[in-house]
Amino acid sequence: MTSEISCFKAYDVRGRIPSELNQEIAFKIGAGVASHFSTKSVVVGYDVRPSSLDILDALARGIASHDSEVISIGLCGTEEIYFATNHLNTDAGVMITASHNPADYNGLKIVGSGAMPVSIDSGLGDIKSIAESVAYNPNIKPDIKDADIRDAYLDEILSFINVRNIKPMTIVVNSGNGCAGPVLSLIHI
């Protein structure tokens, strides 16, 4: 049975929790991602929203329903998912975030291998069609593997500058409610 999933937008998935995006829908989208990309592995990460861990659990079950490995980099920024998709050589990456939307929303940003962003015209529409036809199975138990990519990510960021050319200074950064704080606190130049 096909039922319309309304949280698909032009470049990502966003919806109010739980009416437009919930565990059942996240499961179906996870299955859609795994099916569309014929994945062997998918890297996932999430932001600080209260619903992110529930969405992660359901998304991982959906991905696992297609015998795909789920690799979590944990709490992170969207840019870290782009990096991890390349660095870990996964078939896809999914960031659980609703970006600037209100607190009662959450969403998913999806990239293919090589960290290629997916839009409604380049795969997101296909993922939506697959997700709408998937049967929800909350009993699947995903084997989520954790990966720490922070050191490699920092090395990549710092490779763009010559730190010897930077004069010593003190910089104060407030990442607000964003996820850049853990990365920024590791940078000591």
Please provide the spans of the model-predicted regions.
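Active-site flanking residues adjacent to catalytic metal/cofactor-binding acidic residues
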Residues: 11, 46, 96, 173-176
